[in-house]
């Protein structure tokens, strides 16, 4: 189980809170109403290490425990939930690579994910389901030892 020193965690939360107060909160309406990509905010998220928040330090990430990460997401979401999706979906893919990737894949992708140089994401949709995950019916079935067959 990952751990973090309480003083270090408090300092991290204080940094996030200052960033939210100074940079995020004043701009939420501007970006939301203009339906504009928050490029400057994303760059700041890179600088804060949010794209590597849960990635192991071995690959350049912060290696935060889930509880610390969840608190960060909660704090940011309380002001602007939409921007948490930018790094949350990214970290879902990073987690899959870190847990299930080959050593070569990990060495290649995780350092780039950790810095935000490249970002992962996910897309879930079907013609009759849209993005309603409960309605998705497509499945992948193993086809011998060579791979999978997808029914959609």
Each language-model region and where it sits:
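Short secondary-structure junction/hinge motifs that connect adjacent elements
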Residues: 27-48
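Internal helix-loop-helix
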Residues: 17, 47-107, 111-116
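Glycine-rich, Trp-frequent "lid" loop and neighboring beta-strands that shape
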Residues: 61-62, 104-152
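Short, contiguous strand/loop micro-motifs
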Residues: 3-4, 27-29, 96
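A generic secondary-structure micro-motif detector
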Residues: 6, 30-32, 62
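N-terminal capping segment at the start of a domain
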Residues: 17-29
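Intrinsic disorder at enzyme termini
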Residues: 1-11
